[in-house]
């Protein structure tokens, strides 16, 4: 049982790091002034998360918050601290 919990925790952490890298690549490749491209990329990520999770809209919403908005917030705070 302990091994399964550790495996699930490692998988969630690796998935979070992967999503953080995806958000970083999106922020580097897409100009932030062209918000329609960022919006389209966000919609594409919502669809991908929906197909991966595919249980309910509420679960997809929480997964999207955890694995997209939280990494974006961390990147935003990191760049804000660098500019100070």
UniProtKB/Swiss-Prot annotation:
Belongs to the papillomaviridae E5 protein family. It comes from the Viruses. The gene is E5. It comes from Human papillomavirus 51. This is Probable protein E5. Pfam families: Papilloma_E5. Keywords: Early protein.
